[in-house]
Amino acid sequence: MSRTPRSFCGHAFHMQSLSQFDTQTMRSLHPISSGTQSGDQTARSLHSFLINHIPDELLGQTAFVPWEPANRIWRAQAQSTWQEITYTIKVIQSEIATRIYFGKRWLLNTLRNVFFLERPVRVCLTAPEVLCVAAGFGLEQITRVGLPIVAVSSALQALLYRNISPDICMSTDGSFWAAEHFPPAPTLPVLFPLEACIPPRVFKYSPISLLNYHSHTEHFFLQHLHIPSVSAQRHGSVMGTALEYLLQCGVHSIYLAGLDLHPGKGFQHARPHASFKRFNPKRTEPLATCIAGNFDNRSLETYAHWFYSLPQEKIQKLTRLNTEHAPPSNVRTITYEDFSQHAFAKKDTFTFSEGPPISRIHKKAVLRHYFERITRSAHHARIASSIASSGIEKEAFEFLAYAELLHLRKNPSQGTQTLIHKVRHEIVQLRNKLSI
């Protein structure tokens, strides 16, 4: 059932969504009527509300209507509100473009990871203090670590080059180049969601534990194959997922390295980094592309926006390792030098327990069952109910033919045959790639 967007006072709400909020909550979401929240807090509330209540496919049907008398009286609040609305629209547009471009890759990753997964492990973390490592240029200053380390996959090469071995690696990137971050024979435990791009060698050498975003597709495979998983929150960056994971595990103090949140004078990533392998010093075009990329700070701005919007109860558990010229932030900071001189009592705080092996015959049977369900749903008689549902069929359509699905929802009388043809074609392609 479609929802009709209702817009007023610089906000966009859905009529059915409003009824679940009481007056106090509505005041907290309304920057003009609320006198108890700061502008930054109100902006964060508005952004969260819009993200959670404007489906991607309804963005084009959502209008934001200003209330001019309020805009004139509360100019600062109005400006902050419209800036947050603009930012939210850009985020949703980015999500739409990303899903259209990478949707098929994410589903292929999911199916490949199910196919290669043989003996998943359970991870238990009991460390009171942890170092969480990103791949920012500041990481080059790290020299000694006395804490358990959770590293994102893009930071692995820089850490190993400095003879620093992480205790666990986390990867959430579903793009095809994400596999380049892993060393030739990785042996450290790896946490990732099914949609991440993980090279087959990781399954051969590393203990594997799955993150679970609680999508219907994940539930289908995890339930049918009896695979243990760790609950996780989806974020625009792996560092966001890693932080939420550590907080969920009850870590009291998290030190952050390589999380620069501002552009540097040189390379934006700590070296060595997988992205630098593509550049040949004898060719000017790739080097010029790399240099130009250093002046494009849009991804850093989005990254910083999320990080600075964390609630205070989470912020107070974080300490960021800062470079000398880093801008001020709302997070406590120390220098890399001070951190290296700090005495920590590192203990074995990660424990792993192997689950039962998964037979290849069982995996192939479950994959065939999945393909058969999606193929049956891509039919004229079932297409409407498949789209209206919130199951694996709808998610498969979004993975395989998101642009066609958006067109169909915008023009219900058109596009059905195009969507069906696209989904069936992509299913055949996937089955051929997996030989199933």
UniProtKB/Swiss-Prot annotation:
InterPro entries: MptE-like (IPR002826). This is Uncharacterized protein TP_0177. It comes from Treponema pallidum (strain Nichols).
